[in-house]
Amino acid sequence: MSVLSKIMRAGEGKILRKLHRIADQVNSIEEDFVDLSDAELRALTDEYKQRYADGESLDDLLPEAFATVREAAKRVLGQRHYDVQMMGGAALHLGYVAEMKTGEGKTLVGTLPAYLNALSGDGVHLITVNDYLAERDSEMMGRVHKFLGLSVGCILANMTPAQRREQYGCDITYGTNNEFGFDYLRDNMAWSQDELVQRGHNFAVVDEVDSILVDEARTPLIISGPADQATKWYGDFAKLVTRLKKGEAGNTLKGIEETGDYEVDEKKRTVAIHESGVAKVEDWLGIDNLYESVNTPLVGYLNNAIKAKELFKKDKDYVVIDGEVMIVDEHTGRILAGRRYNEGMHQAIEAKEGVDIKDENQTLATITLQNFFRLYNKLSGMTGTAMTEAAEFHQIYKLGVVPIPTNKPMVRKDQSDLIYRTEVAKFDAVVDDIAEKHEKGQPILVGTTSVEKSEYLSQQLSKRGIQHEVLNAKQHDREATIVAQAGRKGAVTVATNMAGRGTDIKLGGNPDDLAEAELRQRGLDPEEHIEEWAAALPAALERAEKAVKAEFEEVKELGGLYVLGTERHESRRIDNQLRGRSGRQGDPGESRFYLSLGDDLMRLFKAQMVERVMSMANVPDDVPIENKMVTRAIASAQSQVETQNFETRKNVLKYDEVLNRQREVIYGERRRVLEGEDLQEQIHHFMDDTIDAYIEAETAEGFAEEWDLDRLWGAFKQLYPVKVTVDELEEAAGDRAGLTAEFISESIKDDIHEQYEQRETQLGSEIMRELERRVVLSVLDRKWREHLYEMDYLQEGIGLRAMAQKDPLVEYQREGFDMFTAMMDGIKEESVGYLFNLEVQVEQQVEEVPVEDEKPSLEKEDAVPAQAGARPEIRAKGLEAPQRPDRLHFSAPTVDGEGGIIEGDFSSDDDEEPVRSEADGLTRAERRKQSKGGRRRKK
């Protein structure tokens, strides 16, 4: 055990003793709750809420609340929480990550802290890895909460904002991490308070916390809209790279010349073009220099085309269905429907596959999962495998990890790895092993790392006449049903990675599923007939349990579930998760991994060394070796990948920390505007700051006689209808030499405030307040969006600062701060300019109509007096709401630390124009191309 691990686990015993004491307290009062009627049990919820309101803490209420939930679960679900589940629930309430092995009933554990923390009325979020689990858990565990009088909601991908608002209003809300994160971002793009759906971030329990906070934390959540980008280049470069040859890097010191037109580093997932490749590309495109600034975008297209050709494999990284490229999640093997890679990568893959190329996207709002979860006042989580990542949980989220003991001792046999020289020999051995175990009836779960390999294995099994189920990205609709029955006698299930995670594999089959199916056949619904369902469930469960009990004994005799891994994963944790499907609740079980030198992990790390060992030992292809050195090499490779990934995540967080502080300021400002805070005073500050900035820029150097006051007054005239003249000020000061910056500033400020009052008199104060709100929101959104674009651009090139002996992070922080300050100044200046110069038409309305429903009128009309209680409708050029593309995409974590992935498409009109600046009619991207010759892209 490393020194760090020992430090991390120092207080473990103390915490476990505390959790044991809590479980004992709950047990000591359990009898008091057994005798209560359903109505009396339900009435306790209101009593607890009142006691909390009267000043008792949730910790004081914990034993009674937990005992209440235990009794309710017994009556509604026919399940009683074990003592270890009580300990797990207490750990979650105290804000720890509870490590609970597979089959220990994590879902049921979640009901305890959820009920207790919901008593405060501030809402509890239970976060799962996919929509299926969120819906299943909210229905099943929701019965317990509803029985006790709490409301339960569930956020699903296809819900409308009104439905989402209703779900967030519930005491307890289930949903996926991406949905919660995107709702937070969407709330911070809302145009009116009525569009907001979330009500704060009080307490979150994250199920499969390692998957969400570790595996998926490398890539930020991104909401993006179409950018202005030519798509013809993708197709041209896709054809062009087929004519380029892959080669190896050269080494001038060793006198090795580079070969081919480009090189590929699979480990780092990067490509580099060689001189010969550059020459060919220049020749084919008819340009003199590929690296001239005007051709910079072409380098990005070329790199993406090579990556699409070499690093992204069909049926492993993505599948093509109905002419659409769909990404496959490396961790779960599921298809990520509607998601897309960022940075032009998806378009390059579409061009490679010859399907329609869709638009590229520009970031509108973004946050990393790490920073999103740090918004919660209290965070906790549960998983079967957390101790390997304890240092990361502590360092990034300040979360301690507590290993909760199992209810029964673990008796699974973990066999040592078998290593073969070739992949074909390995799969032959796998099929032989499956056939042998299948013949005696032992259930088998086979884990593969890609759709391609699961289908290859499926073909081999079919050739041998072995009946089996395949569970991969192409069949995830049926996954829960398949996984639930994977423990039946003679069952063979081939699953891609951790598909079906969250569903227990019970030996002999799952009685819960059978009982539920029987009750639904009788026309009962757990949502509609809560009382009848609760009454009928115990008998149905009893019948189902009898049916599977005999089969359970048979399977137990055969050795339990046999888990067979066909490849080691990059992370030890994912290997442990696969193993953990077997040996649940003290059942017997067995696991083994089969490896070959062709496996991705072996190929990228240490493969040559292992190859030498096998050659020296003269091992035939079909004979496995069990060698300690090879096992150590694998452990070392996994450790390297884990360290590399941890560093990536830490790095992402360091850079996002800069944006995070800026985001807090902007989103805080937005929320104040949305909530109707009076902006009049703030607008006056905007005016003063803008005037000061103008005057300082013109008068910072030289004497008064040298100042170009005509240019300064020209700027004032663009900002507002200035009435004070230079001559008047000179006269008041005696002469030009008597003018001071302070005197000019005071005079202009008095003038601008006076003109603003006149503008308000002309429009009416209520309309002016609404105009202020709209203008500030509109300008703030556009400036923030442009700032995100600039920050993206800055981060892409910041690594090069290291060559100048500068710390890229420090430079990013410094320049990011300068850009943020410039953006804030821009918001002030543009807001003031809009407020004076917008031509406004006002219509009175009783109900609020979205502003974007009609094009703004450019005619100025007389102000209509506002009726009490109704918000005036303002139409003005440049104030269409919202000022962002309607076609939005949602980019969620991917699996290799590459660019984000885009999910969802809330489209209205496909021919939306990019947002254009009032000043020159160009988008920011077009202006950048004019001034800098296009945006650079990272390799």
Curated annotation (Swiss-Prot):
It is found in: Cell membrane; Cytoplasm. GO terms for molecular function: ATP binding; protein-exporting ATPase activity. It comes from the Bacteria. ATP binds at residues 85, 103-107, 504. PANTHER family: CHLOROPLAST PROTEIN-TRANSPORTING ATPASE (PTHR30612:SF0), SECA INNER MEMBRANE COMPONENT OF SEC PROTEIN SECRETION SYSTEM (PTHR30612). NCBIfam families: PRK12904.1 (NF009538), secA (TIGR00963). This is Protein translocase subunit SecA 1.
